[in-house]
Amino acid sequence: MGQRGISLKLAFSLALAGALLAFPADALEWKWSYQGEGVAASGTLITRDRPNADGFYEITGIKGEANGVAIAGLQPPGTSIPGNDGYPVDNLVRTEAPQLSLHGFGYALANGTYANPFYGAHFAKPDTYAFASDPTNHKTSEPAVTFTATIVR
């Protein structure tokens, strides 16, 4: 085997190792989206690979966009997104309806706004809602949304 063959094998091995390290073996990847009045969001969630006793998987990572703005990061569980104090997220999702918990998951957007989709069982019309806040401009919204999430690997 020539030097070129060894270099190609080494490059392939390094690329494969990098891919395996980038996606933990104990994680699942989900495709998710929601749409409602004035909002459309979608992307990828990374969760632990085992559900809790209620069938919920803990979300550990997020990528995507909302209304064309990139998602900058996941809100830590047990904390509230800015502008929604008193409503901490738990970052849980499951395969069966309702797919989100009462606390839902939260994320920051690159433009300084935040979102928290959740299942509002306590609302007059139980449904999935997406609380959105723009702390800089003191604006919030909470439309009902259609949420879907599916495990892809």
Q: What is each of the regions a protein language model found here?
A:
Residues L28-R153:
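Mature extracellular "passenger" or substrate-interacting domains of secreted, surface-exposed proteins
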Residues A22-P24:
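N-terminal signal peptide c-region/cleavage motif recognized by signal peptidases
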Residues G2-F12:
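Bacterial N-terminal signal peptides that target proteins for export
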Residues I6, A15, K31-W32:
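Generic detector of short alpha-helix boundary/capping microenvironments
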Residues A11-L20:
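Bacterial N-terminal signal peptides
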